[in-house]
Amino acid sequence: LVPLDQRAWHAGASSFRGRTNLNDTSIGIEIVSDGIARDRRNDSNRYPPYDAYLEYKPIQIEKVAQIIKYVAARYNIPAKNIVAHSDIAPSRKKDPGAKFPWKELYEKYDIGAWYNESDKQSFMNEEKFNATSISDIKEELRKYGYEINRTNEWDRDSRDVVYAFQLHFNPKNATGDMDLETFAILKALNKKYPN
């Protein structure tokens, strides 16, 4: 346990919302979890599906919620800055994984960011996804806070970012592939949290 006023090496090489080296400006909360089921750990899939991840115990979520509430209030941390290791280092980290209940933290404890379902549905109904360029989609990811390259292709690093976003906001559909639902969620988040 590192005192809150001291630096720890929990994030490693990382970035979010234009900041890098987040060890200097963040507080990490480590949650003990096996993450991926033992019988699925040898899968060669870089993007494990939702059912490969293990559930968290309710007491873990209750305790982590208490810690986050305390730290966020003490340091006035905006909802959008409550993120996962996978959000800040998508090519290296997958924790806390697909079964970490971000939506529950938002709804039950008022922690973190979450999208409005009505906005998501509205963006899904617009049917503009297929006409949206890769560079425009990547710009939406950057707008939310993710560091992503400016290539006009879905290379491995870009898919890592999409997978990290999906782990956080669309975990049952976490594949690393950008799709209509994931894009609609991203647009809904950028509408709700414009800065």
List each model region and its residues.
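Short, well-ordered, mixed-charge alpha-helical segments that flank or form enzyme active sites
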Residues: 36-38, 90-93
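Acidic, His- and aromatic-enriched active-site or binding-groove loops in soluble protein domains
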Residues: 98-124
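Short acidic, glycine/serine/threonine-rich helix-capping segments at coil-helix boundaries
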Residues: 125-195
